[in-house]
């Protein structure tokens, strides 16, 4: 685990204690019982790919540790609607407050504003957070292999499956990929950002792609900024793309999405 990821996870453990003190698991489970059924995240991705189109998971992100504030004019409702109107298959919403200036309320607001399934983009380390994701309206969660043991990955995936939540499992290298492939989820995310050097290279996805069984869905993440990169990845067989910063830095995120993938 890299220094920044270790720092984030350590802070997340402290935050988790505070959250559990404010709202116990039994209360959280009672809240989940009152929520509407999840939207089909995997189905939305598969449907777009079946049409021969890229499945774009469009991200709503205000800030990051590496870039600072990315978007000052930040309204998750209008951004979600803009993405939905310009071809996004799903949304990803940052909910980590300390490092990404995200919020659970942003996810709830974005989901209510459009019909798309929504991924909770956060650092999930405990089953409590899976129940929490379901309670705030998420349809999918992220599991980062670099931050979790095999036993933790399997436990968190099992909890997600019991709640009908999709799982996007994220890897950075071949060793992490082999661990991810032990899980049942079809969604394999390849993060092109090297957490040690903080550079992004789509070659990371291209290098790992041949190791992934065809029945899995490859989601390439981070650093996709040009139509040439999209064309290269599509030609290699990548069907799904998680993109955020490239859209968030523009005046009209939906237009940027359409230009990058569909014009």
Curated annotation (Swiss-Prot):
The keyword Lyase applies. GO terms for molecular function: indole-3-glycerol-phosphate synthase activity; phosphoribosylanthranilate isomerase activity. CDD domains: IGPS (cd00331). Signal peptide: none annotated. The keyword Amino-acid biosynthesis applies. GO terms for biological process: L-tryptophan biosynthetic process. Pfam families: IGPS. SUPFAM superfamilies: Ribulose-phoshate binding barrel. It catalyses: 1-(2-carboxyphenylamino)-1-deoxy-D-ribulose 5-phosphate + H(+) = (1S,2R)-1-C-(indol-3-yl)glycerol 3-phosphate + CO2 + H2O. Coiled coil: none annotated. Keywords: Amino-acid biosynthesis, Aromatic amino acid biosynthesis, Decarboxylase, Lyase, Tryptophan biosynthesis. It is an enzyme of class 4 (lyase). It comes from the Bacteria. Pathway: Amino-acid biosynthesis; L-tryptophan biosynthesis; L-tryptophan from chorismate: step 4/5. Its EC number is 4.1.1.48. PROSITE patterns: IGPS (PS00614). Belongs to the TrpC family. NCBIfam families: PRK00278.1-2, PRK00278.1-6, PRK00278.2-4. This is Indole-3-glycerol phosphate synthase. It comes from Acidithiobacillus ferrooxidans (strain ATCC 23270 / DSM 14882 / CIP 104768 / NCIMB 8455). The gene is trpC.
